[in-house]
Amino acid sequence: MAMKKLLIASLLFSSATVYGAEGFVVKDIHFEGLQRVAVGAALLSMPVRTGDTVNDEDISNTIRALFATGNFEDVRVLRDGDTLLVQVKERPTIASITFSGNKSVKDDMLKQNLEASGVRVGESLDRTTIADIEKGLEDFYYSVGKYSASVKAVVTPLPRNRVDLKLVFQEGVSAEIQQINIVGNHAFTTDELISHFQLRDEVPWWNVVGDRKYQKQKLAGDLETLRSYYLDRGYARFNIDSTQVSLTPDKKGIYVTVNITEGDQYKLSGVEVSGNLAGHSAEIEQLTKIEPGELYNGTKVTKMEDDIKKLLGRYGYAYPRVQSMPEINDADKTVKLRVNVDAGNRFYVRKIRFEGNDTSKDAVLRREMRQMEGAWLGSDLVDQGKERLNRLGFFETVDTDTQRVPGSPDQVDVVYKVKERNTGSFNFGIGYGTESGVSFQAGVQQDNWLGTGYAVGINGTKNDYQTYAELSVTNPYFTVDGVSLGGRLFYNDFQADDADLSDYTNKSYGTDVTLGFPINEYNSLRAGLGYVHNSLSNMQPQVAMWRYLYSMGEHPSTSDQDNSFKTDDFTFNYGWTFNKLDRGYFPTDGSRVNLTGKVTIPGSDNEYYKVTLDTATYVPIDDDHKWVVLGRTRWGYGDGLGGKEMPFYENFYAGGSSTVRGFQSNTIGPKAVYFPYSPNGYDPSNDYACATQDGAKDLCKSDDAVGGNAMAVASLEFITPTPFISDKYANSVRTSFFWDMGTVWDTNWDSSQYSGYPDYSDPSNIRMSAGIALQWMSPLGPLVFSYAQPFKKYDGDKAEQFQFNIGKTW
């Protein structure tokens, strides 16, 4: 048998040699073994055509060309007279790809890696590639500390030369760090140095960052942290000599040893700047000033380089190079910093483009730009455009990319890449409290109507005590200079008694128009006119309410429950907004201040003014803005003019999800004190606690909230990363722990006249609560959950520990 194979091989070789030396003209080309690959596709990949004279080299090139297509496992080329016979064995086609046992790596990520290697459903299977993928995946598991992991590719043949590919994972357990040793440290203790690491050999319960599970990438980051720690404290000669990672025999434990050389501390002796400064030497010199004898600090050096780049970027130098070279003098332990600057070319902006704005029109984004086309590139202007787009609240993310124009030495295109979020919402609110039970509200709002930037809203509330409807439209760019124009129509039918407030009914309707004027990047003013008609009825004889009516020249009856009163008021509305938040929703940095007010103008029945001030400040406490402290306040005050009081229905209220969580909405503050009356045998003592003042008329206390003409609310929140949520959804989910406090009081309450009752003019009756909140921009809409426990409250306050809102967005 062996002799037969040798004979056949010899005959084939001699045959090839014969036509290799003499060559022959190909009259026809035949294929054997083709199944999936078309004959035409195979012919196109071959260098030989019918009519060509071929030799041995041509045959070799043909075989190589067919193998290069990746479609064949075996290729043989034979001669049958004047016919070239090509025998192939096709690689099997991948019919399906499945995964089993992979917990640390998602299926989508595995599919992406396979596709990057050319392994996908419908393509031919290259077994050598599979072996590389197995090894690569195992190396990945090793890098995250799973040294017992294994990956096996299982190939199952199917009919018609197809296969099923299944990757079977056995991940094992992550090796835990048993000990981290630092050798060579004298200035700082090992514990002090390791306290800045992410990887730890011991993790206290309160440390949510530390991790005992070994990961190669985290170790690299920790070594860089160690290097920066020393360089920032003057150790300019610091060096990490070596790092050893040892594995225990059972592959479940890791020992890490870091060998370092600290060196001595060095002080900066000076900074020398050279190179192409593009005429900005004086400004660059200001950025490189140092204090005499200051310790060398690597972070400050890096910041100085970045500041120089930003400075040049503002003048159109898009790609400056700044390199700092420390010149170390070991004799006197000083460092002279030589900074070489090459500003490079100055660039114009050819075009500004937008990507990802499928709904928002280009004009809506372009009007927020401060960088102009055809002008010098200004990195600060580009950044301002990014900030303004973020503050619109239309986008989840905004990124910028400065791209060189091919073939041009001094032109760039600026590209803003946005990811749009749902700006329309249908909100359905639900609250539940131990005393209040269940309450509902609804509203429809579209902040980016048809991509035009218009804000259009139809909001309403329908429940046991209120029917409210509002239509509002705002054009943020009524003029090209950014003057906005907004209008509103509203109707409100309010039954106060059913809302646990002092009993009255108010049917009101009105309208207002407001113009907004931008002052600069962060400040704007508003001014407008409004009209409102109020029709009051069913007013029970309540002290604060009667006090207002008396100031209006009315003389309501304490024996008649059906007191009524109507007013028509015209108001001048004004406001100021300072907004330096980093984005429009879920901000992580910056401040916002909003002042709103109104005052009645001649022709009104009432005479009063009212002012509200809202502030919010976000302070990130880490570089990634995942941990943020939020402080919020709300202040309000109003009073009458010309001897009249501010209407009681304009009072401030507190309590609920937007002010002091844990309390029922609008129930914090003064409570109603009623004059007694007994129509139809009605006995007020059945509903209220009545008392007699010095033998005078009876007064009755209640738990009905009436609000006040002054309010102060504050909140401190600690925003944290949401557990079990990946970074992909970090911009859609927010968790926070909060402490709310607030009070409402009545500055016109005469405590001396009502000495037997609470002093509702006292602003020190502060309510407090603490709890946790979760906000989620879900596919169903914005969801807000909060649970709060009041820990400082007063008689008559009503708790509502759990509150949430749910809505739909589009």
Curated annotation (Swiss-Prot):
What this chain does, per the record?
Part of the outer membrane protein assembly complex, which is involved in assembly and insertion of beta-barrel proteins into the outer membrane. Constitutes, with BamD, the core component of the assembly machinery.
Q: Where is the signal peptide?
A: 1-20
Q: POTRA domain: from which residue to which, for each copy?
A: 24-91, 92-172, 175-263, 266-344, 347-421
The protein's location, in the record's own words, is: Cell outer membrane
Q: What's one GO-annotated cellular component?
A: Bam protein complex
Alphabetized PROSITE patterns for the sequence: POTRA (PS51779)
The UniProt similarity line reads: Belongs to the BamA family.
Q: Which UniProt keywords apply?
A: Cell outer membrane, Membrane, Repeat, Signal, Transmembrane, Transmembrane beta strand
Q: What is the protein's given name?
A: Outer membrane protein assembly factor BamA
Q: One short Pfam family name for this protein?
A: Omp85
Main localisation, per the record? membrane
Tell me the GO BP annotations in alphabetical order. Answer: Gram-negative-bacterium-type cell outer membrane assembly; protein insertion into membrane
Species source reads Escherichia coli (strain SMS-3-5 / SECEC)
Q: Assembly state and interactors? A: Part of the Bam complex, which is composed of the outer membrane protein BamA, and four lipoproteins BamB, BamC, BamD and BamE.
